[in-house]
A protein has these predicted regions:
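Hinge/lid segment of periplasmic solute-binding proteins
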Residues: 37, 41, 45-51, 115-167, ...
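Glycine-centered hinge/linker elements that transmit conformational signals in sensory
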Residues: 228-257, 301
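Long, aromatic- and glycine/proline-rich binding clefts that accommodate carbohydrate-like moieties
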Residues: 298-300, 349-411, 439-451
Length: 451
């Protein structure tokens, strides 16, 4: 039993009731009703100094209310006293940002935005942070891979707050009983899967475009040609990797969909790939198998030089500043403060104390990660995978990439199409959309190259 709060007070006198009169109750109810038209329920906090409130930096937090409240508290406690910059913090859903920006009612700074910074940058709606003189020193706080998706036309339009990537989880007890070791490569995983299958067990590998792209990077294949004018999924190397990827599900019986947490817990799926945040979830939700499983870097691809490339894809949530802000310098000061190790460490400690270990904050700041609650052995394994991260650089029309790679996968696995034919068909569709979007934004296309 955990006691959160304890209150001591004098013994109350029972039988005494305090009731407001009719007119007081009526006046209070009317006041509540009228206030419902003017109260901003999204507002978490405003500038402490009323004289500065009209000049307050407007910050939207696209996360839960608990997270927004912590941002507000840290801002009032640390940022405003040090800089003198008043800040108004609102808890607003990320889905509201686009419509508010179009209407000219958007914020100055957006915290915990989705990985959509590129789309705002492409439409000149995001402020280029790399134009600030001290940007390089601020960007050095992060792994290079976490900045890739925040770049457009040579400029950076956001800074990462959180960094996520996948790792491998395996049951040490089950593999030991079967005389197996954790796989280092995909080929080793395939060999292990046959033994597991004979024992009515399976392997959990996400059947998504991201898994294919990850394997593509591990094998040394390029995704784009001519600086993003078109994709290279129809090359021999890319098709070979795609064939290997689809064979996981066609030939080796890997499940297409599954609930990893419970299957891993029961032992039905003793090996699987999931975001490294799964580590905390398993420790909380499956205490009966504590000490019987481990987390390790992803299986990789054995290269010609004898080294194993186990690149994982990095996913970030970012902080950005909108281009129509009237307070760019103040906004930059806030972003620098918020992405610094002190603020990130404080936020991580606060959020874990409120929501528990399963909600541990995965800060993109390298120093804040070192300050986190992970123990030494856990940090060592995570850092090993962090040293092999990459990301897909966003391009105009990039939304078509994941969609059509998944369509190509379905056409092979569900409809029996040839991997080669599927990749030729859907690569053509992707490249056509790339050309269309590049024309829309006045960029060079494949057709221009042909001329």
């Amino acid at each position: 039993l955990t006691i959160k709060n304890m209150h001591l007070q004098k013994c109350l006198t029972f039988g005494v009731h305090f009731t407001a009169g009719f007119f007081k109750q009526f006046a209070f109810s009317v006041g509540e009703y009228l206030a419902s038209y003017v109260t901003d329920y999204e507002l978490i906090g405003t500038a402490a100094n009323a004289q500065l409130s009209k000049k307050a930096l407007n910050v939207w937090v696209g996360a839960g209310r608990d997270q927004a409240q912590i941002v507000r508290n840290l801002t009032a406690k640390s940022f405003t006293p040090k800089t003198g910059i008043a800040v108004s913090v609102k808890n607003v859903a990320s889905t509201s940002l686009l419509s508010a920006t179009v209407a000219g009612m958007g914020p100055d700074v957006v915290v915990r935005s989705s990985p959509d910074v590129f789309n705002y940058a492409m439409r000149s709606a995001a402020y280029p942070l790399s134009e600030f003189k001290d940007f390089e020193s601020v960007a050095s706080r992060f792994d290079n891979a976490s900045l890739i998706t925040l770049k457009y036309m040579g400029k950076y339009y956001g800074l990462p707050e959180t960094l996520s990537f996948e790792m491998m989880f395996y049951r040490t007890d089950i593999l030991s009983d079967l005389g197996l070791e954790a796989p280092k490569t995909w080929d080793e995983l395939i060999k292990i899967s046959s033994v597991l299958s004979n024992n009515n067990m399976s392997v959990g590998i996400p059947s998504t475009a991201n898994t294919y792209i990850m394997m593509l990077m591990q094998s040394g294949n390029e995704i784009y040609g001519d600086s993003g004018m078109y994709t290279l999924f129809d090359t021999v190397g890319a098709i070979n990797v795609f064939t290997k990827f689809t064979n996981f599900y066609e030939n080796y019986g890997f499940p297409l969909s599954y609930e990893f947490q419970n299957r891993f817990r029961s032992g039905e799926m003793p090996i699987g790939v999931a975001g490294y945040e799964m580590y905390n979830t398993l420790q909380i939700a499956a205490p009966e198998i504590n000490g019987l499983w481990k987390m390790a870097p992803l299986p990789g691809t054995l290269r010609e030089n004898g080294e194993i490339n186990n690149t994982a894809l990095a996913t970030v949530a970012a902080v950005m500043m909108l281009s129509d802000t009237k307070m760019p310098q103040e906004g930059w000061e806030f972003i620098k403060w918020w992405t610094d190790s002190d603020a990130q460490t404080s936020f991580a400690d606060e959020i874990e104390s409120i929501l528990g270990k399963s909600s541990r904050y995965n800060s993109a700041n390298c120093t804040a990660f070192e300050n986190s609650s992970w123990n030494t052995s856990e940090k060592t394994v995570i850092k090993e995978q962090k040293s092999s991260l990459s990301a897909v650089e966003p391009m105009p029309g990039g939304y078509y990439l994941e969609r059509n790679l998944n369509n190509a996968f379905r056409s092979v696995v569900y409809k029996g199409a040839s991997p080669t034919d599927a990749m030729y068909e859907y690569t053509y569709k992707i490249n056509s959309e790339f050309t269309k979007k590049r024309k829309e934004f006045g960029l060079k296309t494949m057709e221009d190259k042909g001329e």
